[in-house]
Amino acid sequence: MGKYTKISIKVPDVNRSFVSNNYKYSNTNVIKENISLLNNIVKNYSKFMNTWGEEFEIDNSVISGFIATESGGKNAPPNKFKATGLMQVTPDTVWETIVKWDNFVEVPLSDKSIKFFNKSIPSSKKFNSKTPPSSAVRNEILGALENNSEFNIAIGTAVLRWLLEALKENGIANINKVMVSYNAGYYAMRKKVTNNPTTEQLIDNKNIPKESRGYLLKMLGVNGFLDLWFKNNL
């Protein structure tokens, strides 16, 4: 038995292809490019994914899919929302995940996780739930997220687990809801995404940003990243 709620993943969960830049994911060249992308992510980051995937009980297929979708496997610089790195995490998300972990997750952060986070961002030792991080602390976190790939993957994977536990209903950790919330924000989505919807239902939900609905297809559609992972035994 694992520590956390078990995740149920059906791949593909929807019989649609993701469309981006006029290319369908049924396009042979796009499929080859995405298989190559996943292989490169495994080659470059499997050690970190294995370590933190095991810690937070998230399969490498899911972590790789998020990295591929969020950053294309590149250590991306901060965007206008201050999201950065392989898993496009923001400083505020780091702070919130650490200080509010116990509000949603029954299993406390392990000593291993706390020690690693404290080493990566020393200011985390002084985090508290009542005081958001200052500009100086945000910059410290931003630097760690941008320059430390293991920290980015570790905290990104922790965020996935936090969301899985926060959004579970009737003991089910719904990966669809997690994907939408990771992309558009937990607090923005928690009232718009209730019960345990299928990917198809979420894609057709006009209350969810178009980008987030495309995000779902990119991960869970036919020839999406999770589908390609399992088809090619990565």
Q: In which residue ranges do the predicted regions lie?
A:
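Short, functionally critical alpha-helical segments immediately adjacent to catalytic or ligand/cofactor-binding
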Residues: 57-74, 86-97, 156-158, 178-183
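Non-catalytic cell-wall polysaccharide-engagement segments
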Residues: 1-26, 37-40, 54, 96-234
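Amphipathic, Lys/Arg- and hydrophobic-enriched alpha-helical face
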Residues: 44-54
